[in-house]
A protein has these predicted regions:
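Short coil/turn helix-boundary motifs
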Residues: 52-53, 129-131, 155
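Transmembrane-helix signature of polytopic, lipid-linked glycan biosynthesis machinery
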Residues: 125-126, 142-157
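Membrane-interface anchor segments at the N-terminal boundary of transmembrane helices
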Residues: 60-139
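Hydrophobic/aromatic-rich transmembrane helices and adjacent perimembrane loops
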Residues: 109-113, 156-176
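Membrane-interface junctions at the ends of membrane-embedded or membrane-associated helices
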Residues: 126-135, 171-205
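Transmembrane alpha-helical segments
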Residues: 116-126, 144, 167-179
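Membrane-proximal stem/loop segments at transmembrane-domain junctions that anchor or position
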Residues: 1-88
Length: 205
């Protein structure tokens, strides 16, 4: 998977490219020989990256973006390419190839940009509020490890969907800090709204 993750593919840099299967077949289905060939490929690829810095930056930049900034995380595609026992109705066709799918992709994209910003802000608030402990930094550390792993090994946007979900608690903490922060004054504004008597209380008075 490391050999595959460091090479080009038809989909995006570092995605599935069949290298591991080819090495296994060329080695006569000998796992040890295929593994040795994979390490030879990896060393050769690392040397190439070292001699071509601009290419390396372009390769890994595209690999990161193709995995983490694909808003549907292949959730629609993975269903579309499967065989369907029943004929698709207008909803299914609209989701796969029509305006319904486009709408959800726009919605997911907006949601993910907000989540990424809020997650980064959440980490910032954890440090400035001195709330860093094993409970609060565990999920960010898991995500950091996942980022490093998928940076090097075979990539795919659906692989990182699990880690997107793990961003939500830290992002939620950011919203909590913003809503209750002294700079936004949102909490103060909401408090004043609660002090305004409603119509029923006025009639009783």
């Amino acid at each position: 998977y490391l050999d595959a993750g460091l090479n080009e593919s038809a989909m995006a840099p570092g995605w599935y490219n069949g290298i591991a299967l080819d090495d296994y077949k060329n080695a006569g289905l000998d796992a040890k020989a295929a593994n040795a060939q994979a390490w030879t490929n990896i060393k050769s690829r690392m040397n190439y990256f070292g001699k071509n810095t601009n290419y390396m930056i372009d390769f890994f930049s595209k690999k990161i973006i193709s995995q983490w900034n694909e808003p549907t995380y292949e959730s629609i595609w993975v269903s579309k390419v499967k065989s369907h026992t029943n004929e698709l109705n207008w909803i299914g066709n609209g989701m796969y190839d029509g305006s319904i799918g486009q709408f959800f992709e726009l919605y997911f994209n907006f949601y993910m940009q907000i989540l990424f910003i809020a997650f980064a802000a959440g980490i910032y608030f954890l440090f400035i509020n001195r709330k860093t402990n094993i409970e609060t930094v565990l999920l960010p550390l898991v995500i950091l490890g996942a980022f490093g792993y998928h940076l090097l090994f075979e990539g795919k946007s659906q692989y990182v969907l699990t880690y997107i979900i793990l961003m939500i608690p830290t992002a939620s903490f950011a919203f909590e800090c913003i809503l209750n922060g002294k700079y936004t004054k949102i909490k103060e504004f909401v408090g004043k709204l609660k002090e305004i008597p409603d119509g029923k209380e006025s009639e009783k008075a």
